[in-house]
Swiss-Prot record:
GO terms for cellular component: cytoplasm. This is Arginine repressor. Belongs to the ArgR family. The gene is argR. It comes from Streptococcus equi subsp. zooepidemicus (strain H70). Regulates arginine biosynthesis genes.
Amino acid sequence: MNKIERQQQIKQLIQAEHIGTQEEIRRLLQKDGIVVTQATLSRDLREIGLLKLRDDRGKLYYSLSEPVATPFSPDVRFYVLKVDRAGFMLVLHTNLGEADVLANLIDNDAIEDVLGTIAGADTLLVICRDEEIAKRFEKDLAAGL
């Protein structure tokens, strides 16, 4: 089996179920008759561009990344510890004293669908144009956590 076929198989496994570790992926591949070293698997996962997401119970799992351009500057993700959404509003949690820095970054990005921000000491309220945009931004920001 060549690299492309192996990576296709990995993508199918990731789409079929929530897999949380490289060891789980390696075992599932082995069940299908594909033996890979940890180093090869690690390289494959990096090349595929998998994301580590958290499910509703807090368990981490791999997910295929979608090539979506983020409207936020790369520095924004550095400050976000947690993302919550209430309708068309996002609540971004930061370390103490960093919410205003994050607000300035988002305001400077001049994102058309962000109507405004309000910062506290460690919490930032981001008001989005509508709920769908808030959902998209929530997913985008949460993917970087």
